[in-house]
Amino acid sequence: MILTIDIGNSNIDLAYFNGNKIVSHYEFETKKFSTSYEYALIIEWTLKREKLQEKDILGVALSSVVPSLTSAFIDAIKYLFGKPPFVVEPGIKTGISIETENPKEVGADLICNVVAITEEYGHCGIAVDFGTATTFSVVEKKKFLGAAIAPGVGTSAFALFEKTAKLPQVDIKAPESSLGKNTISAIQAGIVYGFAGLVDGILERQIKELKYKPVLVSTGGWAKRIVPYTKYLKEKDIDPYLTLKGLYYLYLKNL
């Protein structure tokens, strides 16, 4: 059994792999001031839920975009399993050529996503990750060509609430019409249909710059709320575990 842990800005995803299949998945809120002891307790709790012991885990893979938590998790994993995890960081084997100005600054989540695309979906693809940020990662012929990064759906909605005096926080869902008849439906229309337009606009530009027709795969917590209203993305191509799959494949490449 392989344990994979993906630390994001909003959530921490944890999955157990048996072979190349996810047998269980857990999601926790990211708390940036928690200690390694607290995270060790969380991991230990998932082990008990799965009726597993530490000796059943052959390896642990860690991806993080929150530097302050990376060391806490490394210490927690060392404490539980007696050895450090594999960490997605510059210098690891990816099987992908990073064609950017500074490969070392490419986020671990973007690397995981393009590796998963290459391993599971084909030689050319775009991963759209609807997280705290909305990212568009492009891979073609095992080359990471670049990315686009936009604010996340929830991030934008919260900023609208925080920076305005009279606009309320709303449940982010698509209203019946883009013509909002009240403040709540107007905000919902702006966020949902606005992000759908943002996604289509970026994808249209990226697709034109590629030599081959890309596979389009979406992931992230906001995907199900936005994808149905886009032109390019399909609900059937939402892969909620894309980043974790990429992390698993990276672990195997670095054994």
Swiss-Prot record:
One of its GO terms (biological process) is coenzyme A biosynthetic process. The active site is at residue 109. Pfam families: Pan_kinase. K(+) binds at residue 129. SUPFAM superfamilies: Actin-like ATPase domain. It catalyses: (R)-pantothenate + ATP = (R)-4'-phosphopantothenate + ADP + H(+). It comes from the Bacteria. GO terms for cellular component: cytoplasm. CDD domains: ASKHA_NBD_PanK-III. Substrate binds at residues 107-110, 183. Its cofactor is NH4(+); K(+). It is found in: Cytoplasm. The keyword Nucleotide-binding applies. ATP binds at residues 6-13, 132. A monovalent cation. Ammonium or potassium. Its EC number is 2.7.1.33. InterPro entries: ATPase_NBD (IPR043129), Type_III_PanK (IPR004619). Pathway: Cofactor biosynthesis; coenzyme A biosynthesis; CoA from (R)-pantothenate: step 1/5. GO terms for molecular function: ATP binding; metal ion binding; pantothenate kinase activity. It is an enzyme of class 2 (transferase). The keyword Cell membrane does not apply. Keywords: ATP-binding, Coenzyme A biosynthesis, Cytoplasm, Kinase, Metal-binding, Nucleotide-binding, Potassium, Transferase. Catalyzes the phosphorylation of pantothenate (Pan), the first step in CoA biosynthesis. Homodimer. Belongs to the type III pantothenate kinase family. This is Type III pantothenate kinase.
